[in-house]
Amino acid sequence: MEISVFSIQKSSRDNFENEIQEYIKMSAKFAKINDKIIFNEKIARAQSSGRSDALRAYDEIYEPNLKGFCVMLDENGSQLDSQEFAQILNSNSQINFFIGGAYGLSQNLKDKAQKVVSLSKMTMAHKVAKLVLFEQIFRGLCINANHPYHK
């Protein structure tokens, strides 16, 4: 199984990133996990230009990666409990999660996904959402392996 998380953000080495790397390391016994951070000058310029330019730039970056089972994170997506989330992981050998940039994700991109998921009804910083996603990936893998992490 291979799981990739794509995010549009500037690279940083902070405590959030350290925790994410820890979850990747712990998950490695169950699946290959990839953290794909994407940010370039084109995205920076597009975000400065406004919402429509930014969403178009996100589409250009993400569309070539729409392979396997694709899950978009969006505040209006389905809310799942950890067991339901684990079923997504259990049912697919290649899973790609996509976290939007400052302007979220375009409807076009969400329409191409197999699943659109919300981590919470609350708004949270992208780095917090990403950390929560990696924890839920680890938890889901543990549920599927009958590992005691999920109690």
Curated annotation (Swiss-Prot):
Q: What UniProt keywords apply to this chain's record, in alphabetical order?
A: Cytoplasm, Methyltransferase, rRNA processing, S-adenosyl-L-methionine, Transferase
What reactions does this protein catalyze?
pseudouridine(1915) in 23S rRNA + S-adenosyl-L-methionine = N(3)-methylpseudouridine(1915) in 23S rRNA + S-adenosyl-L-homocysteine + H(+)
Q: Please give the SUPFAM superfamilies that the UniProt record associates with this protein.
A: alpha/beta knot
Positions the record marks as coiled coil are: none
Among the GO molecular function terms of this UniProt record, one is: rRNA (pseudouridine-N3-)-methyltransferase activity
Residues that coordinate or bind S-adenosyl-L-methionine: 73, 100, 119-124
Q: Where in the cell is it found?
A: Cytoplasm
This protein's GO cellular component annotations are: cytoplasm
Signal peptide (from-to): none
The primary site where this protein sits is cytoplasm
EC nos = 2.1.1.177
Question: How does the annotation summarize its subunit structure?
Answer: Homodimer.
Function statement: Specifically methylates the pseudouridine at position 1915 (m3Psi1915) in 23S rRNA.
- Protein family: Belongs to the RNA methyltransferase RlmH family.
Q: What protein is this chain from?
A: Ribosomal RNA large subunit methyltransferase H
Which species expresses this protein natively?
Answer: Campylobacter concisus (strain 13826)
- This chain is encoded by the gene named rlmH
